[in-house]
Each structure stands twice: as C-alpha cells, then as structure tokens.
C-alpha cells in the first residue's frame, strides 16, 4: 500500500520533468526487449548486455544530435527576432520549431552542447545500467547522465582554453552545500573545492532563498567557508569573487577582509539591480505580498493547519513556517511537521492565485516549497543569477554558456525555486551535498 502510494505520488504532473520522462520512454523499448533470463549462461548474458549498451548509447547519441540542432535553431530564431526588432519589420515569417520542441513541448533552453553518449558510457561503467534486467533506467540514472554530460562539456572547454570556459558557478544553500537547515562547518568537504574554483578565477555565487538584509546570518551559515578563505593565500581580488545573493534576487553581499575582520558586506542595490527590476513599483510589490499573505491565512484555516504554524512577513517575502509546541511528556519544545501534501497544496494554490492577480503580473515572484515551509519571494533565482553575471563583469557580462548553477529543486511547476535558474545558465540537478562534492571533484580534477 505504501509503496503504491509513493509511486502514484511521484507521478503527479507537477513533480515530473518532461525531458527526463521522454528519455525514460525511449530507453524503455530496448530494456523490455532484452529483459530475459539466460538461465545462468554467462556468454548470453554478456552478449545481451553489450547489445543493450549499444542501443542505449545510440539513443543518447541521437538525443545529443537533437540538442545540437535545437541550439542552432534557437540561435537562428534569436538573430531573426533581433533583426525584426531593429528594422521595424511588419510582416513576421515564423521560422518553425526545432524537432526537440515538438517531441518535448516543455523543453527549455540549452546553452551548451551535451556529450550524452560519452556521459552514458561513463555512468554505465560505474553503475552497470545496461546489465540490469528487472529495473529499467530510472529518473535518477538519467539525471546523473545529464549532469555528467554538462560536467564533461566544461572539462572539454577548459582543456581547449575556449572562450566558453566556466566563469561563474552558483549554488543553492540547503541540501546543496549543506543539509537542510544546516551550515558549512570547517570540516565540510566542499570548502577546498570552492576555494580551488576561486583560485582558478571562477566566480562563486551562493543564490539562496534565505532572505536577510544583514550579513550576520549568512556569515554564520557559511562560517567554515569564509574562515578557510580568510586563511588561504589566494589574492584578495580572487577572494572577492565570493558573493551571496539572498532572498533569491533581493540582497547582495560580497566577501571582504579588513585587517583582522572578514565576512560579507552589503552591496547597494544601485550597483547590481537589473534594469527590469528597477521598473517594478513599490505598490505592486506591496500588494502582491499582501495578497499572498491573505491567501496563506485563508489556507491555514481551510487546511486546518496547526495553530503553531507561523505566517511570517518580510520586506520582500512572505511565508508559512513550522512553529514549535511544548511536549507534555518531556516538557521540551518540539518543532511541528507539516505534511507533504499540505505543503504542496499551499504552494500550488498560492501560485495559482497569484497568477490571476494583476499587480503580481507586473513584477516577478517565486512561490516554492522549502521542504518544511512555503514562501513567496519577490524576484527569482533566474534574476539572481543574471544579476551576478552582470555584477562580476559589467563590461563583458558572463554568458549563460559560461555559467553553472547547482541546486536540488528543479521540478518544473510551483514547488521548486532552482527551476528558474535554467533560464540564466547551465545546471546540475543534485539531491544531496554529497553529490555536489562528487560533481565538483569531477569538474575540477577530471576524475
């Protein structure tokens, strides 16, 4: 019963990724055709595995070609669109769509080529995907293959000393650099990897939903990293390439050292806000947060959420967070837990309600489920990443093809705030801080 429930839950439309599901469907045919028993005959097993591996690899090679075709097609469309805008053309001739858009209508933008065949063979050598007869290639298998392909691309660009080498790497905080609700302590294995990236001239941005207008909280959560950075022999200019973008795109802090003191200093909004963000009126921002707050109070009552659940209003965000209650047996304060279904009902209803609210349509906002709470932030991670791209190099902004965002929340609808980062750069979809470390080691050391 519980197993079936879990499967059905993960098939909900807002939890699926169209591209990964499509690839799973393509791989299902060779898996089903070769899911046979050879009664212990090692030669037949080996032959079947080789045949399955070959067919899987061919599928990924074909997808690789479709991605390349889409990149070229999108570039041509962008050039045509710019030509129309600059020449005031009245008659617009549609150029059509790349084939991948027709096959996967929800597909996003690819900023780089992806060596998917090579990535599959590498993952298959480690995990023996082709040798499985009872378990088909899974969502996680494909997620890892896509991640590995992206890493291989940047390794190749570094070796070629290409103009599209990695220039900026951004990270989510919780579940990416540290466990949910945790912090970077001195023993965190990600620290030397981040310092290594900085030493190679790569800018580092921590783009987090945690929104605070002062630096102390970020200094506390990232203490292990900034302590290591302060004690390193990196040139100060490279140390300064560590920034925190708080509230997704609302507060920017940059690393500094001044004598014995070090930490993060706040950067004035005039120095980094994108032009489109400057056009948002304060009235629209306030009305959007007011509306979201009223919606949360209404949902708290309708869903009979615990009284201890707190609706918290900030300057640029509003959310519902779990409170605490006193355990009658132990006398200790215990954190309440909101059910997964309650969190998703709240975030999806909030998103749907705001979509029909006029002031919200004149700005950008982001509704997401943080795992134990739900928030509505002004802005979004795509804006946070883009702001950093321009802030680090105003004269020659970092391109999406030179940007890598690492995060754990990429579900396409409602509950995931890393999803929008796909609009601003390449991405790695990880599920734990351990995976972040593994991919960074591979990226840096070509392991």
UniProtKB/Swiss-Prot annotation:
The keyword Hydrolase applies. It catalyses: IMP + H2O = inosine + phosphate. Allosterically activated by ATP. ATP binding is a prerequisite to magnesium and substrate binding. ATP binds to 2 of the subunits in the homotetramer inducing a closure of these 2 subunits and the release of the C-terminal loop, thereby activating the enzyme. One of its GO terms (biological process) is inosine salvage. Its cofactor is Mg(2+). Mg(2+) binds at residues 172, 174, 408. Pfam families: ISN1. IMP binds at residues 172, 174, 180, 208, 373, 381. The keyword Nucleotide-binding applies. Keywords: ATP-binding, Hydrolase, Magnesium, Metal-binding, Nucleotide metabolism, Nucleotide-binding. Its EC number is 3.1.3.99. GO terms for molecular function: ATP binding; IMP 5'-nucleotidase activity; magnesium ion binding. ATP binds at residues 126, 144. The active site is at residues 172, 174. Homotetramer. Belongs to the ISN1 family. IMP-specific 5'-nucleotidase involved in IMP (inositol monophosphate) degradation. This is IMP-specific 5'-nucleotidase 1. It comes from Candida glabrata (strain ATCC 2001 / BCRC 20586 / JCM 3761 / NBRC 0622 / NRRL Y-65 / CBS 138) (Yeast). The lineage of its organism: Eukaryota, Fungi, Dikarya, Ascomycota, Saccharomycotina.
